[in-house]
Amino acid sequence: MGDNIVLYYFDARGKAELIRLIFAYLGIEYTDKRFGVNGDAFVEFKNFKKEKDTPFEQVPILQIGDLILAQSQAIVRYLSKKYNICGESELNEFYADMIFCGVQDIHYKFNNTNLFKQNETTFLNEDLPKWSGYFEKLLKKNHTNNNNDKYYFVGNNLTYADLAVFNLYDDIETKYPSSLKNFPLLKAHNEFISNLPNIKNYITNRKESVY
């Protein structure tokens, strides 16, 4: 981009982690500015909202030079288009976005369980296996059609949908380590993504966070 890039978020994975994974995969340098979430540390975030012209007074915020971008999903789509990881065709771009939207649905349910202690039994017995089955089926269809040893959800190359699914299960497995045991392709996909050199390096050196 040429401009200085700063990602503003809390000291957590949360809604910024997929953006960080995209930067890691692409090898893009940026400043990962994290706000504390407790006590006096939270004052810094309040001051930030006053100083920056943020559209919704929320983070994540991606600043590129003088440009201020808000809303995590919009930022992800913007970066994926700019760096050509959104799909090789108009239809593949749709499929990548479709999977990305599905990830948001189940990630929301996980967050309700993990952060707000809601409906854990329903999540584990119904939501998680149901959505994992959806993703397994989609991955199997694309993997079979392409007949290779790489695991992509869309087409023959990595898209942000792959990183989104990886981020979802990377998050879920911090609390439920055996969540992929009945979904061999999803498990292989996550292992494949986690072993991509830039992703592996990022995860190895990633700062531990509360959520």
Swiss-Prot record:
| Activity regulation details | Inhibited by chloroquine, cibacron blue, ferriprotoporphyrin IX (hemin) and S-hexylglutathione.
Domain of life of the source: Eukaryota
Q: Which CDD domains match?
A: GST_C_Sigma_like, GST_N_Sigma_like
For the keyword S-adenosyl-L-methionine, the answer is: no
Activity at various pH: Optimum pH is 8.1.
InterPro entries associated with the record: Glutathione-S-Trfase_C-like, Glutathione-S-Trfase_C_sf, Glutathione_S-Trfase, Glutathione_S-Trfase_N, GST_C, GST_superfamily, Thioredoxin-like_sf
Which GO BP terms apply? glutathione metabolic process
Alphabetically list the UniProt keywords.
Transferase
Domain GST N-terminal: start-end pairs: 3-87
Recorded GO MF terms: glutathione transferase activity
Q: Which residues form the GST C-terminal domain?
A: 89-211
Could you say which residues bind glutathione here? 58-59, 71-72, 105, 117, 121
**Record bears the keyword Chaperone:** no
Q: What is the uppermost EC class here?
A: transferase
Catalysed reaction(s) here are: RX + glutathione = an S-substituted glutathione + a halide anion + H(+)
The record's function comment reads: Conjugation of reduced glutathione to a wide number of exogenous and endogenous hydrophobic electrophiles. May also function as a storage protein or ligandin for parasitotoxic ferriprotoporphyrin IX (hemin).
Query: Of which family is this protein a member?
Result: Belongs to the GST superfamily.
State the oligomer form and interacting partners: Homodimer. In the absence of ligands two homodimers may interact to form a tetramer.
- The protein's name: Glutathione S-transferase
